[in-house]
């Protein structure tokens, strides 16, 4: 949650895949109820379960759709999982709203502050900025390559009215921005005492947990977890696909990921 990459530069992974109770899970009605079951499987002793439940009750409150997700059937055997009803219309709102809530909870408990430092040419930046903007213990610095994003994403990142948000336009490419961020995580010399440096891209496992929840939710709504589904996932990186794979390792019936 608070470290991003492991000390050896690798990614954090669970020691084991927690298994779900299909008979219990298939009867849950709402996305929040699914999240209340899935998320505590990963928090272990780091957080009290009642604190996690309270946190989840207050996360994703700014989504347009009442149950956060809408599933539209377009053919007898084909449905569309609409993940764009969050505040920035990106599927990343699910993982980043959850991550920001856990960041804030941890920082408040430890009486510390944090800097979110990231690079983006798309929806990660706007989703991260929106997720963190109201938490005074988190300052967000997001590097954006000049001229390399859509107009709506530029506006999402540069018009947020919050003293905690600092979008920075860089005269360079996305790779240039990413290099600056990587060097920052290596040095960390600019950090104050009792201050974390946080990653918000898909290396942060909490983002994956948030996305695991909507794969289980969709499988419950479509066939009550009774038979394997195929998921076709438009994605720019492997994070969203990996969340689907992780759900299958936990017990969600899965045929293919396309």
Please describe what each predicted stretch is:
Residues 1-258:
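PLP-dependent amino-acid enzyme catalytic core
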């Amino acid at each position: 949650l608070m470290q991003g990459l492991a000390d050896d530069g690798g990614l954090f992974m669970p020691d084991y895949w927690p298994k779900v109770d299909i008979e219990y899970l298939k009867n849950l009605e709402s996305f929040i109820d699914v999240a209340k079951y899935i998320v505590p499987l990963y928090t272990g002793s780091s957080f009290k379960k009642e604190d996690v439940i309270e946190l989840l009750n207050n996360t994703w409150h700014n989504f347009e759709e009442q149950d956060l997700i809408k599933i539209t059937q377009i053919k007898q055997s084909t449905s569309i999982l609409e993940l764009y009803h969050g505040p920035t219309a990106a599927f990343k709102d699910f993982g980043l709203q959850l991550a920001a809530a856990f960041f804030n909870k941890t920082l408040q408990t430890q009486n510390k502050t944090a800097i979110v430092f990231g690079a983006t040419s798309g929806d990660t930046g706007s989703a991260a900025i929106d997720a963190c903007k109201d938490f005074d213990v988190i300052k967000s610095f997001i590097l954006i390559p000049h001229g390399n994003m859509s107009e709506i994403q530029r506006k999402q990142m540069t018009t947020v009215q919050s003293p905690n948000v600092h979008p920075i336009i860089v005269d360079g490419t996305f790779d240039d921005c990413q290099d600056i961020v990587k060097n920052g995580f290596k040095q960390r010399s600019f950090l104050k005492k009792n201050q974390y440096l946080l990653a918000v891209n898909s290396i942060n496992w909490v983002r994956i947990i948030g996305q695991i929840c909507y794969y289980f939710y969709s499988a419950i709504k479509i066939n009550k977890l009774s038979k394997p589904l195929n998921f076709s996932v438009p994605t720019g990186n492997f994070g969203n696909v990996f969340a689907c794979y992780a759900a299958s390792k936990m017990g969600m019936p899965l045929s293919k990921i396309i």
